[in-house]
Amino acid sequence: CGKGASLKNFLKHLDPKLMNDYIFEKYRKDDKPVQVKYEQPKYFGQGAKSLKELKKVSSLKLDHPVRQWIVERKIPSQYHYLLYYAPKFYQWVNTIIENKFPSLEKDHPRLVIPFFEKNKMFALQGRAFGDENPKYITIKLQDKEKIFGLERVDWKKTVYVCEGPLDSLFVENCVATAQSDLRIPHDSAVLIPDNEPRNREVVKQIKKYIEEDYAVVLWPEYVKEKDINDMIKAGKTRRQIKTIIDEHTYKGVRANLEFSKWSKTNV
C-alpha cells in the first residue's frame, strides 16, 4: 500500500493478539520484563458485545478442530482474525436478535463471518462445518446490501467481486456478496462467478451481467473446480488464480463471444 510499517506495527494493525505474541517471543529471553500496551479493535453497533464473546480463529490453538478446518482449506493466515467460532450458533445469534431461533434443539457449531463497515457489524454469516442445512445462514442487522470486505476494499482500484466470503480472501481487493447476484455499483468491478457452465441459473445470471456491460470472469475449460477455494485446495496458488482471472476477464462483444463458448446449457 506504499506505506512503510514495522513488523510490530503491522501485527498490531492486523491482530493485537498476534502483535502481543510476537513481542513476547522477541523479548522472552531478555532480563527485563516488557510492558506491552495495545488497544483491542473497537466494534460498534448491534452485535458488537456478542461478537466479543466469541473466539477468533487466530486465537484458537493449532490443534483445535476449527483451526485445523481453516488450515485444511488453506485460508490465508493473515485473515484468520476476521473469522470467529460459535460453539452454539443459534444460541449466540439470539443474544443479538431476540428469539431469532425459537428452538435450540438442533443448535450446532458454525464459523461466524462478520460483515463490517467502519468497525460496525451490519451483517453476519454462519457457515456449517458439516452437513447441516442450510450450509450458509446469512443475517442482516441493518437494511443495507450484504457485502463482505467493505472495511478493507480500496474503491480507487479494480474491485473483484465473488459470491463466497472465504473465496474473497484469496484475491486482493476482493469483496463478496454472499449471494449469487454479484452486481455492485462500481465502474471498475470485475465479477467472478462460480465455475458452473452447466448450471442454468448461474449461466442466466452471467448472461445478465454481460448484457449490463459488467466485466466478467469466464473460467477456462481446464479449470475443473467450482470456486476459488476449491482451486486452492486442488493445488493452485493465489498468483496462478489471479493470472487466470486477468487472462479470462471479458466485457462487451468479446464477453458475448466467450460466453457462447463457455456455456454448456441453453438460456
Residue positions per predicted region:
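Short metal-binding segments enriched for Cys and/or His
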Residues: 1-15
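A short beta-strand motif that forms part of the nucleic acid-binding face
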Residues: 2, 55, 128
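TOPRIM fold recognition
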Residues: 134-135, 156-159, 164-267
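TOPRIM metal-binding catalytic domain and adjacent DNA-binding surface shared by DnaG-type primases
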Residues: 14-112, 118, 243-267
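Phosphate-handling DNA/RNA-contact segment within nucleic-acid enzymes
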Residues: 91-188, 193, 201-203
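Alpha-helix initiation and N-capping motif
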Residues: 4-8, 20, 63, 67, ...
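Hydrophobic alpha-helix position signal
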Residues: 11, 70, 74, 209-210, ...
